[in-house]
Amino acid sequence: DTAFGAGGSPLETLERVFLAHVAFVARHPGVPRILYHELQRPAGAAAQVRLRTMVSGYRARLARLVGDAKAAGQLSGTLDADAAAVHLIGAVQGLVMQATLFGGERGMPQAARRTWALLLDGLRGGRG
């Protein structure tokens, strides 16, 4: 919530949220493991429902932020805000998986900055 409300342009906020998400996971590497474990429970389990609700809300907030950045001319006007939000979350999940496989939680913030540069190019639609 702090990263969302710290001010700045929509694109600056989006970057700050992405980097804050990765930094949180780097500081608390057990959290994703617990969440993934909860997803293995039978469909409809209370923890699974709460997790889905939480992630859906986060995805919606990201999509609104992407929409704001589009409206401000910071991102491509043809960008699908919902798909962009899914890919931003997926990028964090990919960084988590890499850190889990290779024990690199401490390197996650640096990897996130490199990943953000790559994502930003796609979000801008090749406009630079």
Question: Where do the language-model regions lie?
Answer:
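Short acidic, glycine/proline-rich loop/turn micro-motifs
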Residues: D1, A45-Q48, L79, A99-G103
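Amphipathic C-terminal alpha-helical segment
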Residues: A23-R27, R64, D68, L88-R106, ...
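Amphipathic alpha-helical packing segments from all-alpha helical-bundle domains
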Residues: R27, A45-A72, D82-V86, R113
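Amphipathic alpha-helical segments used for helix-helix packing
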Residues: A26-A46
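Hydrophobic alpha-helical connector segments
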Residues: D1-V31, A81, A85-L88
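Secondary-structure edge/capping motif, primarily at the C-terminal ends of alpha-helices
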Residues: A3-F4, L35, L39, A99-F102
